[in-house]
Amino acid sequence: MDKGVLMLYNTGSIYNPETENSILSYKDVQAYLKSKVTYGLPLDFAYPAYSWGILMENGNFRAILHEVDFSNTLRYKETSEGNYLVLQEHYLENHHIRKGNVIRLETSKFNEIMRVKQLVASQMKPDSCHTILYHLDSLNLSTFEE
């Protein structure tokens, strides 16, 4: 094997209702890199370019949702940044969404990706140089266009 890929996504727990963003967290990556892990081969680095909704019921994980439209104010009410209370029972992506459920919207924020990229550059060997954006499609790419 000539090189590896350090996947810098899904860094947090989808199961913990206190998690702010399980896709990418600077604090999670920082703690991992502090452990001084070595791989013995050059690494490329993969960063997330996607978002999802984490469906919680009574504080317990139920599902990952990929296509949630929170603009429907009859179904959803934002209770805090990125957290939406379900107001109406409905089905979404073959999941029964119940009134009172909470959906946590998690995104790959450009500034967080850049912070993590700078952290990785300061901690890892200089022979590691390639950047990979994971799950890149036209919808996800549009969030990174200026």
Task: Give each language-model segment a name.
Residues 44, 50-52, 57-146:
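Substrate-binding cleft of secreted/luminal carbohydrate-active enzymes
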